[in-house]
From Swiss-Prot:
PROSITE patterns: FLIP_1, FLIP_2. The chain crosses the membrane at residues 20-40, 58-78, 102-122, 202-222, 226-246. The keyword Protein transport applies. This is Flagellar biosynthetic protein FliP. May be a component of the flagellum. It is required for normal cell division. May be implicated in the secretion of virulence factors. It is a multi-pass membrane protein.
Length: 266
């Protein structure tokens, strides 16, 4: 009797399981079909229009995507980032620590210092060109000229005149009457060359105290007959504590930002 009861219970449970499985499959199919239908009804439709203006809009879209992809390079080429990041890299080499601070830390610090230096320029650029473009008060070419004006003015305030004359000659364009009339494609490489030159000049000054420490440590080791000890390993702690005692990071960051302000003022 117990065996028959057990079989009946098992049979009932098996029947319930089959019924539940069928219901689950049907529910899964319904859940899969309903969102697909809803997505088909509310699919995003990108309408570029028809007629003669279609090609122009496609070209504008491609141009916008190109500018967005080149935005990091534009930031590097036309701002204070070049000088700052090169100086920070040379400082790390002068101290003698090749991997500390790591590259992401130096790049992040350079970006923040660049934002401080370029904030007034970016504000003028936004007010002159980007805001009128967003308010539909200017067309794109006119807005680009207006927005690039403050950036070009900043680069001209920092560029070396000999470097600017070099790229004017290399570009084979008519001699501009004033520096402000120089095309942006000529000002940008001249600005980058000038920034690299100034960064190397600052790097040279940063190397001198650490080089003196290396020479002193090497002389002491030689006088003590410790020829086998690498001077760089012995001098590294002294260079680190020297940099900390003189508050080196504050001096370097402050001097870098002030160097652009002096250049703009001059």
């Amino acid at each position: 009797m117990i065996r028959d009861l057990f079989k009946s219970v098992i049979g009932a449970k098996a029947e319930d399981l089959r019924r539940a499985a069928i219901i689950s499959v049907l529910a899964a199919i319904a859940c899969a079909i309903m969102p697909a239908a809803a997505m088909a009804q509310s699919a995003v439709n990108i309408n570029l229009g028809t007629g003669a203006g279609l090609t122009e809009r496609v070209v504008q879209l491609v141009g916008l995507m190109t500018v967005l992809s080149l935005a990091p390079s534009i930031v590097i080429m036309t701002t204070s980032f070049v000088r700052i990041v090169v100086v920070l890299g040379l400082l790390r080499t002068a101290i003698g620590v090749q991997q500390s601070p790591p590259n992401p830390v130096l790049i992040s610090l350079a970006l923040f210092l660049t934002a401080i230096v370029m904030a007034p320029t970016f504000e003028r650029s936004y007010d002159a060109g980007i805001k009128p473009l967003l308010d539909q008060q200017m067309e794109l070419p006119e807005a680009f000229e207006a927005a690039s004006g403050p950036v070009k003015q900043f680069m001209l305030s920092q560029v070396d005149r000999d470097d600017l004359a070099l790229f004017v000659r290399l570009s084979k364009i008519p001699q501009p009457r004033t520096a402000a009339e120089t095309p942006l494609r000529v000002v940008t490489p001249a600005f980058m060359i000038s920034e690299l030159k100034r960064a190397f000049e600052i790097g040279f000054l940063l190397f001198i105290p650490f080089l003196v420490i290396d020479l002193v440590v090497a002389s002491v080791l030689m006088s003590m007959g410790m020829m086998m000890l690498p001077p760089a390993s012995i001098s590294l702690p002294f260079k680190l504590i020297f940099f900390v005692l003189v508050d080196g990071w504050r001096l370097v960051a402050g001097s870098l930002v002030e160097s652009f302000q002096r250049g703009a003022g001059g």
